């Protein structure tokens, strides 16, 4: 897609990527609507009286068959040569992986991925680099050779990485978008949706972006009335929608918001350089799908494979229960028995 507006290339590029998101929504619109219906059925929302929720029963049966416990890292040398150093390195890597998945709730991430794959049909997780920074001054032992330290160094405002880790993070199936592709290798971009408060936007993207964004109230609690909150409190909880775009073709990562007519880059990464140097660029593997298709990446929910049988079972179960409710209790006895 070419940029036509040469007078304002930033706005033109923003329009291009907003159009990419719209096309991604359109491609999977029918599947998203179907996924919402399946999730509601699983939760029992709108369930008819005397019906039988076979979807919930089947899902709870299949979940432990797909994933039941934390995986155990197994690192081995590719070639079993007489290489003590290689064996030691493999053992160290295996222990590091074991410790890494114990430091956060990796089990929850896997469980949610499997649940999304069983219901709407797509489970997504991503990796995130999480460094812990510490403020330091001029390094010790270099006072004589080093030049006069800057004001920030004298004040102890120079930051160094004190500890770092990589964690897996579950992505809700409705918060993920992708570029066109029949197979995963053809996908050139991915998008992850975030909702950020104004203070978070200011810290991450600066004052200009924070003031240019429109913020809306989240609708998590449908039963809460607006009168419970005054205007001051309401402003504190308003959020704005952002899309984190990983552009594989352009080799960059940036953010999009409908109201800010330009690509948005974090203040600590104004060039959009990818924070992770991954071989396949994206921060996630191919999404988990239980029904594979070599001609399309649009998921097929497992429930669609036995939907007709499930509906038939529900009709039969409903009729049986209605018949039972309509029965009147009667008794019979042998008239030849005078005692009765």
Please place each PLM-identified region on the residue numbering.
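Extended alpha-helical, oligomerization-prone segments that build pores/tubes and scaffolds
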Residues: 1-340
